[in-house]
Amino acid sequence: MGIRLLCRVAFCFLAVGLVDVKVTQSSRYLVKRTGEKVFLECVQDMDHENMFWYRQDPGLGLRLIYFSYDVKMKEKGDIPEGYSVSREKKERFSLILESASTNQTSMYLCASSL
C-alpha cells in the first residue's frame, strides 16, 4: 500500500512539472505623470481562454479590475472605474488607464487560466 501511494504522489508531481505557463507583464515598474494615459500589457503563452487584471493596494487583498473569457469578450470586475481593457488577440490582454491619478498608484497583477 505504501509504495503504491508513493508512486501516485510521484506521478502527480511529474505531471505538474510538465506544465510551464508563462504570463508576462510589462512594465515591471512604471512611473507616470498625473493625467497621462497608461498602457499595461499582459501576454500569456498557453492559449488560455481566461485572462484577468487585478489591483493590490497596501493592506488589502487582490481586487478584480476586469476579466476576459475570450478575444473581444470583456467583463467589469469589482473596481473597473478609471480603467478600460483591450483583447484583440487571445494571448494579449491590455489594461488602460485613460488619465492616471494618484489614487491609482498600486501593484497591478495579470493572470490567465483555462
UniProtKB/Swiss-Prot annotation:
Biological-process GO terms, alphabetical:
adaptive immune response; cell surface receptor signaling pathway
What the entry lists under Gene3D superfamilies is as follows: Immunoglobulins
The compartments listed are: Cell membrane
Q: Which domain of life is it from?
A: Eukaryota
An example GO CC term for this entry is: T cell receptor complex
UniProt keyword annotation of Plastid present: no
Q: Which residues are glycosylated?
A: N103
Which segments constitute the Ig-like domain? 27-114
Cell membrane keyword on record: yes
The UniProt keywords, alphabetically, are:
Adaptive immunity, Cell membrane, Disulfide bond, Glycoprotein, Immunity, Immunoglobulin domain, Membrane, Receptor, Signal, T cell receptor
Q: Which InterPro entries does this one have?
A: Ig-like_dom (IPR007110), Ig-like_dom_sf (IPR036179), Ig-like_fold (IPR013783), Ig_V-set (IPR013106), TCR_beta_variable (IPR050413)
Molecular function terms from GO: peptide antigen binding
Which residues constitute the signal peptide according to the record?
1-26
Stretches of the chain forming a coiled coil according to its record = none
Assembly description:
Alpha-beta TR is a heterodimer composed of an alpha and beta chain; disulfide-linked. The alpha-beta TR is associated with the transmembrane signaling CD3 coreceptor proteins to form the TR-CD3 (TcR or TCR). The assembly of alpha-beta TR heterodimers with CD3 occurs in the endoplasmic reticulum where a single alpha-beta TR heterodimer associates with one CD3D-CD3E heterodimer, one CD3G-CD3E heterodimer and one CD247 homodimer forming a stable octameric structure. CD3D-CD3E and CD3G-CD3E heterodimers preferentially associate with TR alpha and TR beta chains, respectively.
Reported function: V region of the variable domain of T cell receptor (TR) beta chain that participates in the antigen recognition. Alpha-beta T cell receptors are antigen specific receptors which are essential to the immune response and are present on the cell surface of T lymphocytes. Recognize peptide-major histocompatibility (MH) (pMH) complexes that are displayed by antigen presenting cells (APC), a prerequisite for efficient T cell adaptive immunity against pathogens.
Protein name listed in UniProt: T cell receptor beta variable 28
Please give the organism.
Homo sapiens
